[in-house]
Amino acid sequence: MNQTNEQRPFDYIAEAHLTASPHFYGDCVPLAHFGEVLQQAIDALNALDRIKKALFYGRDLGITNVSGEVFQNCNSLPEWISKHPDEDDKARNIIHAIIGKATEAGELLEALQATAIEGKPFDVANAGEEVGDGFWYDALLARACGLTFDGIQRTNIAKLRHRFPNAFTEYDANNRDLFGERRILEEGKKVSS
């Protein structure tokens, strides 16, 4: 029995693949420049990881003062997200999730660097671990924002289908309808399951 689109279960990975670029323009980027920028990103995200570990795990950051500036700490960060004290846990989880997701991306960049620059085999087991850790941070953020993975995935695919009605095209990637995409995000418009 052939299933129609309405009967098929929603498969985010398959749906995402439909809107992925099939092209790779490696000749447009010098390898040395790629390696340099990759290292800068890794260094910045490692510094952010040290901040995350200080903020959420109590580790010593090793910074006692900031020269030339009045020292102000990060205690007020949750208040900048929400002015309601009863929502401080949510605000802290939002901060933790965003910083944590970025630091997991840094670990994936290290895996890419090891392969692309150092010539080591790509470590699939490590990549899976980092994706899983990224999911953990995504779950923390989703819960704090009252969202679900299913809802996020369906809305994301609806946005991408708006951008690429049939499949990925370079024209559509470079000429986006940002207002239409934002409307989909705000409405939580979902693809049919």
What are these regions (language model features)?
Residues 1-131, 135-193:
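Flexible "arm" and connector segments at domain edges
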